[in-house]
Design a protein with these regions (language model features):
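Two-component/phosphorelay signaling modules centered on CheY-like receiver
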Residues: 2-6, 14-33
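Acidic catalytic/metal-coordinating carboxylates
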Residues: 36-37, 63-66, 87
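Active-site beta3 strand of CheY-like receiver
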Residues: 48-54, 59
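Short amphipathic alpha-helix used as the core "switch/output" element in two-component signaling
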Residues: 65-76, 94
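C-terminal output helix
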Residues: 88-90, 108-117
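… and, occasionally, acidic/histidine-rich disordered N-termini of signaling adaptors
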Residues: 130-304, 351-371
Length: 371
């Protein structure tokens, strides 16, 4: 291992021991930073780099165990080697359960400390490599997921579609699809319960099932029944999905299937906003559920907006929800998807999204895209 790329932090209020450890570590090539107290260490705001922490248990003010708790709370991942003059079992157990790598009792042999530090630095190096690999895999999965949602299929001349999806983690359980089937345009949006990788796996599978069903001209209720049966009979940890599939023909006649999802918004060219409110059970929630489609009509200049609950349940710092009424008001003003998404972010006062956030719009015979 390259000692120049690593640093050993030492926190001990005993100046003689602190100095002795500092001299020992420097004599064998380690970079060292010493601190008198736990608070001094926190105030230094240690850099995110390969390191380990040699920490006295009994410190004035914040104890060593208190500092360990603060590091965990602030998601600062530094391997900890505790040193103490009184190694009682409860303290040792608490420290090790919280992730300490070693617990040395004073007086300890120099080689024991050096070996513990070598082990801690190697542990940190390995952990960082694994974290980088994991992040790279998630980034690749995110690119694939976004690619699956890209509106790249040839769209018919009577409609224009645009979608936007932002997961609250690297990948998420929302998706949208737009494709041409025969002379019709089909738009779908779905939200799998939960977040992260597990939801993303189910979302990708569901998206593929819907896509295949549509291209095979399977009726919308049968697509939902097939998906519901597939997910209901498997042990998926209580996962289910809400979704909407909308099919629009060149003359504006349409049909839709809603499975427990937020009712779509229809912004009429006149300025009125209506909702497609007929609904069914979510897929994967109850085996043998029945599904029915409903009809509607779009006129020239009408716009269809579909969203997931990451939009309507976005929360302000005061604990208020963005809500369907607020969204309906913005839709009535003709706001674009980007403007609506920006409004959601502003409503949350710039805080990270708490849920996956997806919007899908479909313009029927517009003079140009309004997204």
């Amino acid at each position: 291992m390259n000692q120049e790329d690593s640093v050993v932090y030492v926190v001990d209020d005993d100046p003689s021991l602190r100095g002795a450890i500092d001299s020992l570590l420097r004599s064998v090539g380690w970079r060292v930073q010493t601190f008198v107290s736990a608070q001094d260490f926190l105030d230094s705001k240690p850099q995110d780099r390969q390191a380990c922490l040699v920490l006295d248990v009994a410190l004035p003010g914040l104890s060593g165990l208190d500092l360990q708790s603060e590091l965990i709370k602030n998601k600062i991942q530094i391997p900890v080697i505790f040193i103490t003059g009184h190694a009682d079992v409860p303290t040792s157990v608490r420290a090790m359960k919280a992730g300490a790598l070693e617990f040395l009792t004073k007086p300890f042999e120099e080689e024991d400390l050096l070996e513990a530090i070598r082990h801690a630095i190697e542990h940190d190096r390995t952990s960082r490599e694994q974290h980088r690999d994991h992040q790279e895999e998630l980034a690749a999965a995110a690119r694939i997921q976004q690619g699956l949602m890209a509106v790249t299929a040839l769209q018919p001349p009577f409609a224009e579609a645009l979608g936007k999806s932002q997961p609250c983690r690297e990948i998420g359980g929302d998706f949208f699809s737009v494709l041409t089937v025969g002379d019709s345009v089909v738009a779908a949006i779905a939200d799998v319960s939960g977040k992260g990788v597990a939801a993303a796996v189910m979302a990708s599978l569901l998206q593929g099932m819907i896509h295949e069903g549509l291209l095979s001209n399977v009726p919308l209720p049968e697509i939902a029944r097939n998906a519901n049966e597939f997910f209901s009979v498997r042990d998926l940890g209580s996962k289910y999905a809400t979704l909407v599939i909308v099919c629009v023909k060149p003359d504006g006649q349409g049909e839709y299937l809603n499975c427990g999802h937020i009712p779509p918004f229809v912004a009429r060219a006149s300025g009125e906003v209506t909702r497609l409110r007929e609904s069914n059970l979510p897929v994967g929630l109850m085996r043998n559920a029945e599904y029915r489609r409903s009809g509607f009509r779009l006129n020239c200049g009408d716009r269809l907006i579909l969203v997931t609950d990451g939009v309507t349940e976005a929360e302000s710092p005061e604990g208020d929800f963005f809500g369907e009424e607020r969204l309906e008001a913005f839709v009535s003003l003709g706001m674009s998807l980007d403007q609506i998404f920006t409004s959601v972010c502003l409503f949350q006062d710039g805080r990270p999204l708490s849920d996956d956030c997806t919007l899908l719009g479909l313009d029927y015979v517009g003079t140009g895209a309004r997204f």
